[in-house]
A protein has these predicted regions:
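Catalytic-core regions of glycoside hydrolase
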Residues: 1-102, 106-113, 118, 122, ...
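C-terminal substrate/ligand-recognition segments
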Residues: 149-174, 179, 184-207
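Short, intrinsically disordered, charge-balanced linker/junction segments flanking boundaries
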Residues: 301-304
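Short, solvent-exposed, charged loop/turn and helix-capping segments
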Residues: 170-183, 231-246
Length: 304
């Protein structure tokens, strides 16, 4: 939606920051609006309401995702003149991976830049498009959480292409931690997009009472969940074990450790008690496409 600073009187006499709200619930997914972020900042600088702007800020509910968007946000105050994200991206990737970029890497990121990182301004839902691998089972689903959305605004071929291109040069970048993180994240997104498309096919087979295709497709869907879990187990950033271990480490007694682990588990599953979860619609609000959760929760839900 339109930025708040664009109101008739802006923020009045108050100083303010140009902020990016990228993520809700810590949900996992490639997402952003690169052009809108850059152009919105310089439009604000040139506007009368921009006289009291004092810098930039990030206001996500979950920050450990989409590093490219945070790097782009924090680049803004250092550049006096409007710049093209298209040009900036190449420099960012050189700095992130080091040395010269292979053409395959650049092509992969161009595919992402013009799809997942070019989300429509008024797209439904909050934050990233949701992976239906993490949803409560059902047919014709269009979201995983109450206020989310899962219908792609781009072709899944684009993320599949990006994943294939990154995989094609994986050996060349072996041992490069930033590349390997991005590789896993991009392949994860491609798998999630395939899962969303596959669930649509499953729903259609169910409607047609096509038992043969239904059985085949549901088995593929379950196998995809396990494959996704296996992929994400290669990175601690996508592991529920890392999340729970970090929570327990904050406790000073056994009771505190158990309490913090319980709260960390509840946050990413039911959120709170049954009333908040079901009647309040908060179940899966903070779902995470993570290793451990996929195999031990989402897979079992769908299989049942």
């Amino acid at each position: 939606s339109d930025s708040m600073w664009y109101r008739e009187k802006g923020f009045g006499k108050h100083d303010w920051l140009y902020c990016m709200l990228l993520n809700f619930g810590g949900n996992v997914g490639l997402h952003g609006r690169m052009n809108q972020l850059v152009n919105g900042y310089y439009d604000a600088c040139a506007h009368v309401n921009g006289k009291r702007m004092r810098g930039v800020g990030a206001t996500p509910e979950g920050i450990e995702n989409n590093p490219v968007m945070f790097e782009l946000l924090y680049e803004l105050p250092w550049r006096a003149e409007r710049f093209s994200p298209d040009v900036w991206l190449q420099g960012y990737l050189k700095a992130r991976y080091g040395g010269e970029l292979s053409p395959e890497v650049m092509e992969a990121w161009r595919a992402l830049e013009h799809t997942v990182y070019n989300a429509p301004k008024n797209s439904p839902g909050e934050g990233t498009l949701e992976s239906l691998l993490c949803a409560r089972p059902g047919f014709h689903l269009d979201r995983t959480s109450t206020w989310g959305y899962s219908k792609l605004f781009y072709s899944p071929d684009s993320t599949s292409k990006a994943a294939d291109l990154m995989l094609s040069v994986a050996e060349q970048y072996k041992g490069n931690n930033n590349f390997e993180y991005d590789l896993v994240d991009i392949v994860r997104q491609s798998n999630a997009d395939k899962g969303n498309a596959l669930l649509d096919e499953i729903s259609q087979s169910y409607d047609r009472k096509d038992k043969e295709n239904f059985r085949k497709q549901t088995q593929q869907f379950l196998e995809l969940i396990l494959s996704q879990d296996s992929l994400l187990s290669t990175r601690k950033e996508f592991s529920v074990s890392s999340w729970l271990t970090a929570a327990r480490s904050l406790g000073n007694t056994d009771a505190e450790k158990k309490l913090y682990e319980w709260n960390a588990s509840a946050l990413i599953t039911v959120w709170g008690d049954s009333i908040a979860s079901n009647q309040g619609g908060l179940h899966d609000y903070s779902h995470r496409e993570w290793s451990g959760l996929l195999k031990d929760l989402y897979y079992l839900r769908w299989k049942t």
